[in-house]
């Protein structure tokens, strides 16, 4: 099985559509998540150190600062979209800070990511989505080329500077790989964590006993986050391309076929999880498959865990009476990602 699900799809598109998507493919085919060894191994080795638990734990004070700042902007007893006002900006600002990207670029980062997502995971099949994906990839790549020029003139200690040093000193990645990796880290560094935080709050509102349990016992954050990851995974499936004919459970698989491994189905397997359809924030053990397995295990798993373990208790401690808003939640139109486009809530009173 190969993770490169983009190339076979791209090759089957009409010539005009392929022309539109040429710049998108220029960068996305270089993303670690779509590459096989040895290219995958080389790129992963370059960025692994920045995402080891010891390095990630060093960002705890900054994550706490960003979380507190966002919570301070929320008005008690108001009705708002929690995605727009909290669960999206939090992980976006964290990864932007890690990469040395100015906070005033938040709107652009979100816009570019949304455009690229239309190609990576949207269920839509329209010409507009391809043009938007092209625009998002071009504008994000141009932004990072400017950032790279600035870092070369004045290097820092941020993640982008470390990638540039690896590129310039050892020539272990091309200039396009440098830009593509920066794009991936920024894109993946906030999209799935936004989904995790949003669906966690939704799950708690729909399971009030667990909500009240979490408010009473915020020390359960560790097991609670693992349960949110299992109960409604932020990426609902992994896609692979068949490289050689074989069978899985008696099902013949032919070269070039796409295989969707549905994570959320595995995470509700009654043979592995007692009362699998129930939300239990103290569930332990909890060997879910949300972060994947093997060489493609999620690079940002520790960062996502840390952000959620900090943000959710801080949110519920500040606003212990969050309830559904008047409007219904709006889900993302996506094949792979599982998250909310908007989550209307009523905050209730504040403890601060």
Language-model segments: what does each one mean?
Residues 1-352:
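Cytochrome P450
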